[in-house]
Design a protein with these regions (language model features):
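Short, surface-exposed beta-strand/strand-loop-strand elements in extracellular ectodomains
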Residues: 24-38, 181-194
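Edge beta-strands of jelly-roll/beta-sandwich modules across compartments, strongly enriched
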Residues: 83-100, 246-259
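A short beta-strand element within beta-rich, extracytoplasmic domains
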Residues: 11-25, 77, 166-178, 240
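Acidic Ser/Thr/Pro-rich low-complexity disordered segments
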Residues: 39-48, 104-107, 194-209
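Beta-sandwich interaction modules
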Residues: 10, 48-84, 155-157, 162, ...
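Exposed beta-strand and adjacent loop surfaces of beta-rich binding modules
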Residues: 13-15, 28-30, 85, 168, ...
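Predominantly extracellular/luminal cell-surface or secreted proteins
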Residues: 19, 34-38, 91, 174, ...
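Disordered, acidic Ser/Thr/Pro-rich linker "stalks" and the adjacent N-terminal cap
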Residues: 1-6, 24, 93-163, 179-181, ...
Length: 259
């Protein structure tokens, strides 16, 4: 038996995880995976095998690393001869087709679906920095980025990468669900270049030019900042500073791709 799954976005795969949780007497003894990149799946679609025949066990998880540098859009999972699979995870990084984005089209340059990602934060006690780029509004506080309460001088920060180079025209800061624990203020710095480890990038970010000067925030609110932005040219990275600490649900950087 087999099934075809379309990925949420095109991406470069680094590994697959086949999970047979709860399938103890009806799991498939074997499996293999094929991939392709295509707008439409039809009988003429060319599939590429990227894993060997895998041996599976019941109520188990198997991770298979792969090296496939070409972006893919679909996965075909074969199970031998039949049975049940609880989850298939496809690990990798988003790699959008930027030719499909118009020169004058305004998009969220930091969106997860566009390749935006969190790099590092000084604190992720209650929520991961990567949540800032997720689609939609946060479903609860745990679906955002929140730091512990700061008992020492200073402020908290997070560094993120845009999907590609872009000119930011509007910043949207959403503090959904954060009512007594939202940051009092925030600011944003930006840069076209960054290199090295996450820790090295964090050190570089301290001196990046200011994109959004320090502004006040409200609880459980979608803030739009456009006229407050400074012109620092196209950027690829940002540092979000929150004063002194707290939680932010989503960060949107609306603008145009710079090719």
């Amino acid at each position: 038996d087999w099934c075809v799954i379309r990925l949420g976005v095109a991406g470069i795969v680094s590994g697959f995880e086949i999970d047979t949780s709860h399938f103890t007497g009806n799991f498939p003894p074997g499996a293999e995976i094929e991939v392709c990149r295509s707008d439409e799946i039809n009988p003429e679609t060319g599939w590429l095998k990227v894993t060997p025949r895998l041996d599976l066990k019941g109520d188990d998880r198997v991770f298979v690393p792969v090296e496939h540098p070409t972006p893919i859009t679909h996965v075909r999972l074969h199970i031998y001869p039949d049975g049940g699979v609880a989850r298939l995870r496809v690990w990798g990084r988003v790699d959008p087709d930027w030719t499909k984005v118009g020169a004058d089209e305004t998009i969220d340059l930091l969106a997860m679906a566009r390749g935006g990602r969190g790099i590092i934060a000084n604190d992720e006690h209650y929520g991961a920095v990567g949540n800032l780029t997720a689609p939609g509004r946060g479903v609860n506080m745990g679906d955002g980025w929140e730091t512990r309460r700061r008992r020492e001088p200073g402020h908290d920060w997070a560094v993120l990468a845009l999907g590609t180079f872009g000119k930011v025209d509007e910043v949207i800061v959403d503090t959904a669900h954060f009512k007594g624990n939202y940051p009092d203020r925030c600011s944003i710095q930006g840069s076209a270049r960054a290199h090295g480890t996450p820790e090295e990038i964090a050190a570089q970010a301290e001196t990046w030019p200011v994109l959004l000067p320090e502004v006040k925030l409200k609880p459980d609110h979608v803030h739009h900042f456009a006229g407050d932005l400074l012109d620092i040219g196209p950027i690829r990275f940002v540092r979000l500073n929150i004063y002194p600490d707290g939680g932010v649900s989503r960060l949107r950087l609306m603008g145009k791709v710079v090719r």
